[in-house]
UniProtKB/Swiss-Prot annotation:
Sites of N6-(pyridoxal phosphate)lysine modification: 245
Pathway(s) the chain acts in: Cofactor biosynthesis; biotin biosynthesis
GO BP terms, alphabetized: biotin biosynthetic process
Enzyme Commission code(s) on record: 2.3.1.47
Listed InterPro entries: Aminotrans_II_pyridoxalP_BS (IPR001917), Aminotransferase_I/II_large (IPR004839), AON_synthase_class-II (IPR050087), AONS_Archaea/Proteobacteria (IPR004723), AONS_Proteobacteria (IPR022834), PyrdxlP-dep_Trfase (IPR015424), PyrdxlP-dep_Trfase_major (IPR015421), PyrdxlP-dep_Trfase_small (IPR015422)
Protein name: 8-amino-7-oxononanoate synthase
Reactions accelerated catalytically: 6-carboxyhexanoyl-[ACP] + L-alanine + H(+) = (8S)-8-amino-7-oxononanoate + holo-[ACP] + CO2
Statement: the UniProt record of this protein carries the keyword NAD: no
Required cofactor names: pyridoxal 5'-phosphate
Oligomeric form and interacting partners: Homodimer.
Keywords attached to this entry: Biotin biosynthesis, Pyridoxal phosphate, Transferase
Pfam families hit by this protein: Aminotran_1_2
Molecular function GO terms recorded: 8-amino-7-oxononanoate synthase activity; pyridoxal phosphate binding
Length: 389
């Protein structure tokens, strides 16, 4: 039996290699003279990264580092236990309250990661027998949350409100939920939230919105998709956000009504049974929130980077996106790997994204821009892309 298991594993690994879907971790050391987004590769080669979700360039901010160090000196490194068992630190409570005030909702709850937050929210609020209508390009954690809930999953074509309305019109038993990314992580486009809210109201559905790639980037004070569309945030029932992207830290949160947060605190297994976020990260995230709220100059720099890149490489197979996520659709996995390798030889780090992360025949380069990039960085990327595409 032991050899049969090993043979099965090896066969699966061989299939991954044969289909150009093999993955390996890359060790990148931040370059001492500049730090992110510049790194040193395993062979000592300098690399300029276009693969990070550190959209505002906050991860290397000294103010965040100082806040984390001060909290470590006071409270230690790890939280030591689950929040309901070992208790929160003041930094946790202050951050959660600040996040709720920022978004104009009643309460927020911290989680260890966005994946845990999405699993916890959906498996707690969505019941077996409920109906979930989800965009086909939603993040995997949203799909897994629905599977864990036992609800019936109906996936509508990406951004297709007519298809969603057709599903909703069929009705059925149980509560109805519309679940969507605010900014889609692989394509970079923005969910049509006003239309989603209209359909939700028409058919009595709730909305769960994952703002992982929207917070900090879109809207007034970086408040995300609803702010981008000038919508009242209260048209959304539950909001998830991460602290590891535009915030430049790590962790996640869920925001909404006090009842929603109370229910999650008492019922969400991924909250109850997870070790609390280190308070040093909460302290750093609180500083990041202030920088993010007042980060209009950083957001404007992102817009300028995006516009300049696309203007310099106008004939590239760009996906439609008004966010820092700029996808180059290459189709074939081997083609994506080849272009990625060519960029790396030129000192640019941008890994190929292949199935199952993206649908079949849609392998791509997922180029992510940061306010920490300089104009010269974008020029170098554009020049290299013109040479290799």
């Amino acid at each position: 039996m032991h050899s049969e298991r090993e043979e099965s594993w090896r066969a699966e690994l061989s299939a991954l290699r044969a289909h150009d879907l093999w993955r390996e971790l890359q060790v990148l050391q931040p370059a001492p003279e500049r730090g992110p987004p510049t790194f040193v590769g395993t062979r000592g080669e300098p690399l300029l990264s276009f693969a990070s979700n550190d959209y505002l360039g906050l991860s290397a901010e000294s103010a965040l580092r100082d806040a984390a160090i001060a909290e470590i000196q006071q409270s230690g490194v790890g939280a030591g236990a689950a929040p309901l068992l070992g208790g929160e630190r003041p930094a946790h409570a202050v951050l959660a309250n600040a996040l709720a005030r920022w978004l104009g909702v009643e309460a927020a709850l911290l989680f260890g990661s966005g994946y845990l937050a999405n699993l916890g929210v959906i498996s707690t609020l969505v019941g077996r027998g409920d109906r979930v209508y989800a965009d086909r390009l939603n993040h995997a954690s949203l799909v897994d949350g629905v599977r864990l809930s036992g609800a019936r999953l109906h996936r509508y074509r990406h951004g297709d409100m007519t298809h969603l309305a057709q599903w909703l019109e069929r009705g059925g038993r149980g509560q109805a939920w519309i679940i969507t990314d605010g900014v889609f992580s692989m394509d970079g486009d923005i969910a049509p939230l006003p239309e989603l809210a209209t359909l939700a109201q028409q058919y009595g559905a709730g909305i769960i919105l994952d703002e992982a790639h929207a917070f900090g980037v879109l809207g007034t004070e970086g408040q995300g998709t609803a702010a981008h569309w000038n919508m009242d945030i209260h048209g959304v029932d539950v909001i998830m956000g991460t602290l590891g992207k535009a915030f430049g830290v790590y962790g996640a949160f869920v925001a909404g009504s006090q009842d929603v947060v109370d229910l999650l605190r008492n019922r969400a297994r991924s909250f109850i049974y997870h070790t609390a976020l280190p308070s040093a990260l909460a302290a750093a995230a609180l500083v990041a929130l202030d920088l993010l709220r007042h980060g209009d100059a950083r957001r404007e720099r992102l817009t300028q980077h995006r516009q300049h890149l696309r203007a310099q490489v106008p004939d590239a197979p760009w996906l439609a996106s008004e966010t820092p996520i700029q996808g180059l659709l290459l189709g074939d996995a081997r083609r994506a790997l080849t272009v990625s390798a060519q960029l790396r030889r030129a000192g640019l780090y941008c890994p190929a994204v292949r199935p199952p992360t993206v649908p079949a025949d849609s392998a791509r380069l997922r180029i992510t821009l940061s306010a920490a990039h300089s104009h010269d960085d974008i020029e170098l990327l554009a020049t290299t892309l013109r040479e290799v595409l």
